[in-house]
Amino acid sequence: MTPEIKGADASVEVEVFLTNAAADQKLVYTVKDAEGKEVAKTETAAGETKAVLSIPAVHLWNGKKDPYLYTAEVALVSGEETVDAVSTRFGCRTFEIDPERGFILNGEEYPLRGVSRHQDRWGIGNALLPEHHREDIDLICELGATTIRLAHYQHDQYFYDLCDERGLVIWAEIPYISSHMPNGRENTISQMKELVVQNYNHPSIVVWGLSNEITMAGSSDEDLLENHRILNDMVHEMDHTRLTTIAVVSMCDIHDPYIQIPDVISYNHYFGWYGGDVSMNGPWMD
């Protein structure tokens, strides 16, 4: 689902991945609003796996203020029989990241204040139950957060759904962290593809994270640079609607070539924790 806002309306491109369709079958595309009312519908031959639907007077997904979601359904139809059908929720919104104004959601400044979240519990590990995910997001919202960095790996689909529903702005990333391994390139590529494909329809996600603190010394490793270029280019090819970022540590110079690869520069600072003191945060924030 790729929505594009056009004035008061939205044009939504839908791409379907289909195998083993018969020549006489067709695809029926339907969009329903949050109340279940049909707002757009079209159909194509089964061999045409892309369609564009128009949503008049579109209701925007507007973060915590109004996290409005539509539901799209695509049905494979043979005669009068529905052979198969899939559905997904999505939201329509615009965003940009401005160096002076910060994060802009639907044309308005939308300050981001948030946390990093690990999918982990004592005695449970990574195998969280739905109630644990709900408790996490309730605590995060209670803090007044507007954004979450989902560190540093793919999280449960249920939590991405909760983020869509609650209007959190999300940074999603792969587990490419701490040190670069030349023999791990194909793994990073595979995980990046999976992250984008599996989570493409979530309106809460605005940036894809390529790596986390992969070096403390900058870009002396050409293979590391090339790996990041490959990931960055691949993400932009797969998704032209979102931005890329990496998380770097304070010691890396902001002009380092490695830091300049993604769209957004993001720093992890630990002043007063691993080193220094909290007063050192001020100059960076200024």
List where the protein language model places each region:
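Short glycine/proline-centered loop/turn elements that form peptide/ligand docking sites
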Residues: 178-182
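Active-site neighborhood of glycoside hydrolase catalytic domains
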Residues: 165, 183-274, 283-284
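Secreted/periplasmic carbohydrate-active enzymes, especially glycoside hydrolases
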Residues: 1-154, 160-162, 166-170, 191-194, ...
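Acidic, His- and aromatic-enriched active-site or binding-groove loops in soluble protein domains
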Residues: 172-176
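Conserved beta-strand edge residues that scaffold enzyme active sites
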Residues: 154-155, 177, 249-251
